[in-house]
Amino acid sequence: MLLYKELLQDKKNLLAFSAGLDSTALLFLLLENNINFDIAIVDYDLRLQSKEEVAYAQELAQKYKFKCYVFKAQTIEKNFEAKARAIRYEFFEELIQIHNYDNLLTAHHLGDRFEWMLMQFCKGAGCVEMAGMQAVDKRSSYTLLRPLLHLDKQELQKYLIKNDFKYFLDASNNDEKYRRNEFRHKYSKPLLEKYLSGIKKSFEYLDEDVKELVLDIETQQCNELIYFKSSHSKRSDIIAIDRYFKSIGKLITAEEKALLKIEKTVIISRKFAVSQTGAYVCITPYFKAQSIDKKIKEKLRLLKVEPKLRAYLASDSEALEFLSLLLA
């Protein structure tokens, strides 16, 4: 039932656990397949049940001899979904860095992917955005794996019931004030119940189309200078830029993506400059304009480096020399 088992074997795996249906199914499937892993759970302290969920996670860890990391989050007043996600991934990535995990495993399933596709479609999206989350997602220091992405929630529930495995139901998943829940209950769940096999097949076709339509561009690095050779397809270049930022835990806004289509240089999150420089797309830290040595300034001018990249390159002689050779 698991996708990409070969990427999990003989690796250090960290499972994002909640004690809910999805992550509990993944936990027992990992055990069933003799894959080693530890778990991490976040207690947002919003429900009385959360204490029971943490206790269950610790009970499983003791029974099956793996580590259980628990993080107690501070109260979130507003924008719960986005802030909870940020807290969760910050915790996971800290554990990955400290304990040298190779993979982060999440229990996203076909229903999650379909919800995302519908939400993107309603916002305005191409086939890349609608294909959405992938089973294998390379990040800067680890690989994010979603081994259940081909399975529907009902298939996971049947597995748990058949084996009499305990799991918890989170009542907040029924609260339609959250947009994802609204899409789930009104649209994706009824459609999956009626057209499951067709929807699975459609995602297979979408994944094939994305591979054909979008070039696989790999970014390179010299210090804090990130670069790749432009594909001469704005669409492919923007997807490569987007993937790089996702790999370091940053998201590009829709407005920033729109600017990347028409501008030669765009500032992302007020921290990064993205620029077409010669035949290359370059990403650097963004420094505000400052005094630059005359010789360096002239060198940057002759290289035709965009002004918003110059302050960083003036501060990093190695990156500047590397870019000079690259553009020669």
Where are these regions (language model features)?
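Generic structural signal for hydrophobic core residues of well-folded globular domains
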Residues: 121, 148-151, 190, 206, ...
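Generic alpha-helical structural element
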Residues: 149, 172, 176, 195, ...
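Short, charged, solvent-exposed linker or helix-capping segments at domain edges/interfaces
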Residues: 81, 194-198, 292-297
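Conserved anion/nucleotide-ligand pocket segment
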Residues: 182-199
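AMP-forming adenylation/ATP pyrophosphatase catalytic core
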Residues: 6-11, 18, 138, 203-328
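Core alpha/beta nucleotide-donor-binding catalytic domains of modification enzymes
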Residues: 1-185
